[in-house]
Amino acid sequence: YMFHLMN
C-alpha cells in the first residue's frame, strides 16, 4: 500500500 500512496 505504501507504494501506491507514494505514487
UniProtKB/Swiss-Prot annotation:
Family to which the UniProt record says this protein belongs: Belongs to the frog skin active peptide (FSAP) family. Dermorphin subfamily.
Function: Has a very potent opiate-like activity. It has high affinity and selectivity for delta-type opioid receptors.
One example of a Gene Ontology biological process annotation: neuropeptide signaling pathway
Keyword Secreted attached: yes
Tissue: Expressed by the skin glands.
A GO molecular function held by the record: opioid peptide activity
UniProtKB keywords: Endorphin, Opioid peptide, Secreted
Origin organism lineage: Eukaryota, Metazoa, Chordata, Craniata, Vertebrata
A single cellular component GO annotation: extracellular region
Listed name of the protein: Deltorphin-like peptide
Subcellular locations according to the entry: Secreted
Annotated signal peptide: none
